């Protein structure tokens, strides 16, 4: 549907900073008995692109519902509102929901690529904090239930990159959704990882570092295009 031909690629790059401790965890215990280690590649902590994609998709869904868009159930694609079930019922008339058209789903590829983000110039610090498990009934600590949480210290800068493929100016609602999630990132309204309820994971895209470029196909090669799109020029306003 959106990949039959090639139209353009929009590349957004910049720097992202964690304003509060960031703990995107592996879910397994690390060697050395850290209870909740953060994710790493070759020893370097990073922000998985999938983590940011999930957070932004949730925000995009909230926005889409607020403007009256019906959203597919991607958690249960065979359920009554699931994409696979809707496609089966509507057949040739089926069109994926606006969120699936941007972020992908069971029947369509994502048009947005989120890249893993690593600390700029390899500069970062990690720390441990000790927490205690609280009994929800007694509201008192549970004896013997201390645990350690590893996190990336606030102020770490990450290399941010995303790409949008085959985006056209006339897709006004899709453009509004993209502007909304980019604005949320710039305003620091997105949180990632664990312990968000106690303030962990707040991130911000630094507006003065953001660069937006559009590339189109010319003579078999990707060539940077002069930005005339009101969507692209207004993306950071």
Model-predicted regions and their roles:
Residues 1-237:
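RNA-binding basic/glycine-rich loop and surface signature characteristic of RAMP-family CRISPR effectors
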């Amino acid at each position: 549907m959106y990949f039959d031909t090639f139209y353009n690629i929009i590349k957004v790059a910049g720097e992202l900073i964690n304003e509060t401790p960031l703990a995107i965890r592996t879910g397994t215990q690390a060697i050395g008995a850290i209870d909740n280690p953060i994710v790493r590649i070759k020893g370097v902590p990073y922000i998985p692109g999938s983590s940011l994609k999930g957070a932004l998709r949730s925000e995009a869904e909230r926005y889409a519902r607020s403007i009256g868009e019906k959203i597919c159930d991607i958690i249960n694609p065979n359920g009554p509102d699931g994409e696979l079930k809707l496609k089966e019922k509507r057949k040739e008339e089926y069109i994926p929901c606006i969120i699936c058209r941007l972020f992908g789903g069971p029947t369509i590829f994502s048009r947005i690529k989120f890249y893993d983000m690593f600390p700029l110039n390899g500069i970062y610090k990690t720390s441990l904090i000790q927490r205690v498990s609280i009994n929800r009934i007694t509201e008192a600590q549970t004896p013997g239930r201390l645990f350690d949480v590893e996190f990336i210290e606030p102020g770490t800068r990450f290399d941010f990159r995303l790409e949008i493929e085959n985006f056209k100016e006339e897709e006004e609602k899709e453009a509004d959704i993209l502007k909304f999630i980019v604005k949320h990132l710039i305003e620091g309204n997105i949180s990632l990882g664990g312990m968000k309820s106690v303030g962990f994971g707040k991130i911000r895209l630094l507006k003065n570092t953001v660069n937006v470029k559009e590339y189109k196909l010319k003579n078999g090669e990707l060539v940077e295009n002069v930005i005339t799109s009101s969507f692209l020029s207004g993306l950071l306003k």
